[in-house]
């Protein structure tokens, strides 16, 4: 099974970040984290366009890279010239042993193995909205029991304090690496806690999104009110 934890903290009442988990008819699960440039009303409109496109794309027969290509072409047509967005799509196989992902200029993701080794999930193509001819690649990893997959928006690592000092990715990775975080919920909430403490009383300048997937033995479902959390077979 898998445990899923989501932390979603918009900088304003409406957000430019978009996060989703979609169960495919064949048993695969598709994870999406997207970030429209900016925040507020304009970014939220772009986020709504991306959501509509993701719900319209063929999630069964297309690979993550092919889905990004399809979405990018339509986002280029539907958005203004200055509208850009990043997106990471990750497909988890029905047997929960394989992931395939593609990233359109999105913030680094991370794969933490049970032995503590961490691999970066890098971008595999340019951001959405720049060119109809953009190309994207798929990258595949094998998954094992107790592995963690961590997807974020850049609002987490780019959190600033009152002196304009950035949090940075190293602080985020230190949380992911910490063996004390053996559950998706705890890891996700700690990442947000570290970013919030760094910001202190400074205003939030960007949305913060964290999505964590943990490969487990469990096959139950639970939902919590503040962060969306579930365990799927």
Q: What are the residue ranges of the model-derived segments?
A:
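… and, occasionally, acidic/histidine-rich disordered N-termini of signaling adaptors
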Residues: 1-150, 200-233
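Short amphipathic alpha-helical interaction patches enriched in hydrophobic/aromatic residues
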Residues: 54-58, 75, 160, 176-180, ...
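Alpha-helix boundary/capping and short turn/kink residues
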Residues: 62, 80-81, 162, 181, ...
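Cytochrome P450 core scaffold surrounding the K-helix E-X-X-R motif
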Residues: 111-114, 160-166
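Short, well-structured alpha-helical segments that form the helix of a local strand-helix-strand
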Residues: 64-76, 172, 184-196
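Divalent-cation-assisted or electrostatically stabilized phosphate/pyrophosphate-binding catalytic cores
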Residues: 165-180
């Amino acid at each position: 099974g898998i445990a899923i934890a989501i932390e979603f903290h918009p900088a304003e009442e409406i957000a430019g970040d978009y996060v989703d988990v979609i169960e495919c008819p064949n048993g695969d699960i598709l994870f999406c984290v997207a970030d429209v440039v900016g925040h507020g009303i304009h970014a939220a409109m772009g986020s709504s366009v991306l959501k509509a496109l993701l719900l319209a794309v063929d999630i069964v027969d297309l690979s993550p890279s092919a889905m990004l290509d399809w979405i990018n072409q339509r986002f280029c047509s539907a958005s203004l010239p200055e509208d850009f967005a990043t997106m990471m799509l990750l497909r988890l196989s029905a047997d929960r042993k394989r992931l395939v992902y593609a990233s359109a200029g999105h913030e680094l993701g991370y794969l933490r193995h049970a032995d503590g080794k961490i691999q970066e999930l890098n971008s595999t193509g340019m951001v959405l909205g720049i060119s109809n001819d953009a190309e994207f690649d798929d990258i595949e990893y094998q998954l094992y029991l107790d592995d963690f997959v961590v997807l974020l928006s850049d609002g987490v690592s780019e959190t600033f304090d009152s002196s304009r000092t950035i949090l940075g990715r190293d602080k985020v990775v230190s949380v992911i690496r910490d063996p004390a975080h053996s559950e998706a919920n705890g890891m996700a909430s700690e990442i947000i806690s570290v970013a919030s403490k760094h910001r202190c009383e400074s205003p939030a300048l960007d949305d913060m999104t964290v999505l964590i997937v943990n490969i487990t033995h469990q096959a139950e479902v639970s939902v919590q009110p503040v962060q969306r959390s579930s365990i799927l077979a």
